Amino acid sequence: MLVDSAPGMTVVGEAGTGREAVERARSCRADLVVMDIRMPDLDGIEATRRIAADDDLAGVRVLVLTTYDTDEHVVEALRAGASGFLVKDTRPADLLDGIRTVAAGDALLSPGPTARLIARALRAPAVPAADGALPAALDRLSGRERQVLALVARGLNNAEIAAALSLSPLTAKTHVSRIMGKLAARDRAQLVILAYESGLITPGANGAP
């Protein structure tokens, strides 16, 4: 009822299990899936992973809902491909804003409560790639691109990155797009995760949340 009442939004399908969520994402061609972490017959993390790994669903974004912002599975959902998360007691207006911003690609990474939640979730130690793939991937970035990535991880949008580095907004946007391409990231949420997991930035350092 909430989503259908919002201008420009339509519920195209509903699912009671994780497996159904993946099937509905494929059959309904949704732009965005609001995913519960805790569901029967395939939890939300695995469902998110399958959606993110499906080439036919490359444009579908996943917004995860969790009961508590300390849910230990939040970071797993982000690593699986979720573009952001909200706690279930989020106000209706904020939920709609979250849907709009995740659909736009960078919504829940703006400075504020959600950025702090993401940073807190990412304090969980990452499992480093056996072959050092993450740090090696960062070697593909120029010095300027590393600066931009660090600012993305802090939750800055393109305009704020441009102001911080004395760039034009278009140049900042171009840098972000190139970084996504070089790191094979789906969206800005994935860039944040890569920045933390690679050690480029750590919670509480260099102004991070």
Please tell me what each predicted stretch does.
Residues 180-209:
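Basic, Lys/Arg-enriched C-terminal extension of HTH/homeodomain DNA-binding domains
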Residues 39-40:
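Receiver (REC) domain active-site loop signature in two-component systems and cognate sites
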Residues 8-16, 24, 185:
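Short hydrophobic/Thr-rich beta-strand motif most characteristic of the beta2 strand and flanking loop
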Residues 74-79, 84, 89-143, 147, ...:
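Short, flexible helix-to-coil linker/hinge segments that flank and couple to helix-turn-helix
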Residues 28-34:
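Active-site beta3 strand of CheY-like receiver
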Residues 155-190:
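Recognition helix of helix-turn-helix DNA-binding domains
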Residues 36, 66:
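Active-site residues of response regulator receiver
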Residues 17-20, 43-49:
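Acidic catalytic/metal-coordinating carboxylates
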